[in-house]
Amino acid sequence: MKPNITILKPNPTITEMFQYCNAPLKNTRWSWGAVSVNNDIFLRVWENELAVIEEKRFYRVTHLAVYKDKMSHPGIRERLDHVERICSGSPSFMIKCRAKNPKAIPREFKYFDVSHIGVGGKLIDIEGDKWLEQKNIINLKNN
């Protein structure tokens, strides 16, 4: 289940990273994830939106309270589609991102971890939002 990812330069942009995953973003401004040519789902997740439950790591993949009045936003609609695909069995992967200010809404992107991606596991519900288990990590430095 390891995706075929080849990093072509040492410090790619987040847009290039999705391209390297064979999952180009639909829109570089509002897309938070993408579907690969193999129907794998690649999602941006924020490194600080982590819940550890029974020694398992879960990252928030929906934040509906923030978007309750903006459900027509193309980014949230696309994210909900990605979550539905994961619920239906599509393999999923997470690109962990850091915000300049983790408390700001909307957040400004600072950087992402180009050396690893998380392998998604089960989705759980925490207070109305979906959180995706990170069941493994793929080291991209050796690809």
Regions found by a protein language model. Name each.
Residues 1-142:
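Short helix-coil boundary/hinge micro-motifs
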